[in-house]
Amino acid sequence: MPQTVYVLNGPNLNLLGLREPEIYGHATLADVERLCAETAARFGLVADCRQSNREGELIDFIHDAHASKAVGIILNAGGYSHTSVALHDALVAVRIPTVEVHVSNIHARESFRHHSFTAKAAFASLCGFGIDGYRLAISGLAAKIGASAQA
């Protein structure tokens, strides 16, 4: 049975492709989910993609990842990255290898976006690669857990 990676997207990411395309590009959340599924499959993994605009539901998804014995989490918590101690604490509690992803370069934007609580609970953080950051995150996670690319 393939191992599962949870790909969790937070507030407003359901609006990818519509919201500020000059910052976030024209790719949609469906494009992100397709990219994640294809990339995970290259490593013999399955991507369980979920999105919520609610902080508590994102925490529930993290708990679900733990309960289902997921091998990793890719997290784009959106604006909650900069404000949510609760998401940080949930990630620390479950001890699942996590990569934080941001479509835009948060360090080249407003100063309130420069700090990330969730990054402190992740083993890696990627930003500014557009949706390709998800592919890079899954590839990095696969290397971390010892999953090899399938022929």
UniProtKB/Swiss-Prot annotation:
GO biological process, one term: amino acid biosynthetic process
Positions contributing to substrate binding: 76, 82, 89, 103-104, 113
Active site (catalytic residues): 24, 102
InterPro entries on file: DHquinase_II (IPR001874), DHquinase_II_CS (IPR018509), DHquinase_II_sf (IPR036441)
Catalyzed reaction equations: 3-dehydroquinate = 3-dehydroshikimate + H2O
GO molecular function, one term: 3-dehydroquinate dehydratase activity
Site (described: Transition state stabilizer): 19
Keywords attached to this entry: Amino-acid biosynthesis, Aromatic amino acid biosynthesis, Lyase
The enzyme's E.C. designation: 4.2.1.10
Pathway membership, UniProt: Metabolic intermediate biosynthesis; chorismate biosynthesis; chorismate from D-erythrose 4-phosphate and phosphoenolpyruvate: step 3/7
Pfam families assigned: DHquinase_II (PF01220)
NCBIfam families per UniProt: aroQ, PRK05395.1-2, PRK05395.1-3, PRK05395.1-4
Protein function: Catalyzes a trans-dehydration via an enolate intermediate.
Oligomeric form and interacting partners: Homododecamer.
Family, similarity comment: Belongs to the type-II 3-dehydroquinase family.
Name of the protein in its database record: 3-dehydroquinate dehydratase
Organism field: Rhodopseudomonas palustris (strain BisB18)
Lineage: Bacteria, Pseudomonadati, Pseudomonadota, Alphaproteobacteria, Hyphomicrobiales
